[in-house]
Amino acid sequence: VLYGASSRLGAAYAGASDDVALRFQIFGDQLGLAFQIVDDILDVDGDEEVVGKSLGTDFDKGKLTLPFLWMLREASAGQRVRFREHFTADKASDARRLDAAAQRRLLEGFDLKGGVRYAHERADACLRAAVESLAGLPSNPALDALRSMADYVLHRQR
């Protein structure tokens, strides 16, 4: 929402029509959503040295991000029970704080790569919608930079 609002306000401030400002809002909304999805992917499947922060923090905090939601949808009933126990544990309890080995054991049998793949596909779809929202606008360096930003968001490693 923040990306969309700032994109729309920027366009309006520059004198864009309501229609063009709305297109920029759509661009920003989709870009922001994709950025968050990629951030969720990196927390699950990134390289800690490249990302520059500890991985698995969303999991530790009990945040159900898109890769985990997909995994839950595809999981067996028993797997969902294990997962639910972790995510409903008191945030301050030791049941929520897992070291890397314990996380691997909890996630054993889940299709983590499938969740990452699904999330990546959703991020790609958001970015295609973002770029499409700008279609037909006169080409200029600023629009070219926005289109490049969409590509960066999808392929970023940090």
Predicted features and spans:
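All-alpha prenyltransferase/terpene-synthase fold signal
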Residues: 1-158
